[in-house]
């Protein structure tokens, strides 16, 4: 019987000391990068998602290696949507601010998801002072 990976498995598997030839999954790459930013806490959410937070503010989460979800203010959401970087969140398909989704299907998507996390990280840390 195969078990679902835990947050500790993701963190352990994303350790920087892995050999250069080791292939990391999308979520392992994202956990390794975003989880290394000052003040970021990585945890497993109620639905098994890997969530990233600064203080009490979630900056986004990933569902396995295939999707990332975020929340952005209207101006940022509109710009990112116009640029094709985010889509409507599947639970909130009519939203024009707040919930957003990004599919992860390639290395370029992984890099952009990390950049989207950085947008929220910079926003949250700037607000905290």
Regions found by a protein language model. Name each.
Residues 1-31:
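Charge-rich, low-complexity N-terminal segments
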Residues 18, 22, 68, 105-108:
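A general boundary/transition motif marking the beginning of the first structured unit of a protein
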């Amino acid at each position: 019987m195969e078990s679902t990976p835990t947050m500790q498995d993701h963190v352990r598997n994303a350790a920087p000391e892995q050999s250069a030839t080791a292939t990391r999954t999308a979520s392992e790459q994202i956990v390794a990068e975003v989880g290394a930013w000052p003040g970021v806490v990585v945890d497993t959410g109620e639905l098994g998602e890997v969530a990233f937070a600064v203080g009490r503010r979630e900056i986004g989460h990933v569902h396995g290696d295939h999707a990332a979800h975020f929340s952005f203010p209207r101006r940022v959401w509109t710009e990112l949507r116009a640029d094709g970087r985010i889509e409507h969140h599947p639970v909130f398909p009519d939203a024009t601010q707040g919930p957003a989704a990004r599919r992860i299907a390639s290395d370029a998507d992984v890099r952009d998801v990390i950049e989207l996390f950085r947008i929220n990280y910079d926003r949250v840390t700037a607000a905290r002072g």
